[in-house]
Amino acid sequence: MTMISVNEFKNGLTIEYNNDLWRIVEFQHVKPGKGSAFVRSKLKSLRTGAVQEYTFRSTAKVNTADIQTKAMQYLYNDGTSFVFMDTNTYEQLEIPEAQVERESKFLKENMVVNVITHEGETLGVDLPNTVDLEVAETEPNIKGDTSSGGGKPATMETGLVVNVPFFINQGDVLTINTADGTYVSRANK
């Protein structure tokens, strides 16, 4: 744990603030014409997943959090928790559903993700930037149905609903952005 000035903020940095652990989502240095400079930031709680905006004076200092990440393989969901396995020791770890609620729509069995911990407390999982998911259900493509633009909804194998272009069919494997749950492209097979 190190004290840093808010002027040293970087996206992705984890800090301790108000008795919680926060990951910096975005920040902006503001120097108004009158008054002192400040840093406006969006922080995501690693414990609750809530995103909040905070403003710090440019002279403020905060503690960085010492978090650890460990690559683990997702095995299954038993209804109340998600079970992950350390691929080196074969030790299993159960994470309550509430801690991975947002990420659960992107998790496929046998997928390797980074599990985040702080002082022995499991905080959640870090997903890769994109994941490849198969389309489980979508409306069939109708020729010439491109005049309206946009797309159509498709339900992925994990239950995630994504707006996709009209040419996408059931069974296609798509690359999905995990940050916002949007369609990126067809996956290379």
UniProtKB/Swiss-Prot annotation:
Pathway: Protein biosynthesis; polypeptide chain elongation. GO terms for cellular component: cytoplasm. CDD domains: S1_EF-P_repeat_1 (cd04470), S1_EF-P_repeat_2 (cd05794). Disulfide bonds: none annotated. It is found in: Cytoplasm. Keywords: Cytoplasm, Elongation factor, Protein biosynthesis. Involved in peptide bond synthesis. Stimulates efficient translation and peptide-bond synthesis on native or reconstituted 70S ribosomes in vitro. Probably functions indirectly by altering the affinity of the ribosome for aminoacyl-tRNA, thus increasing their reactivity as acceptors for peptidyl transferase. This is Elongation factor P 2. It comes from Lactobacillus johnsonii (strain CNCM I-12250 / La1 / NCC 533).
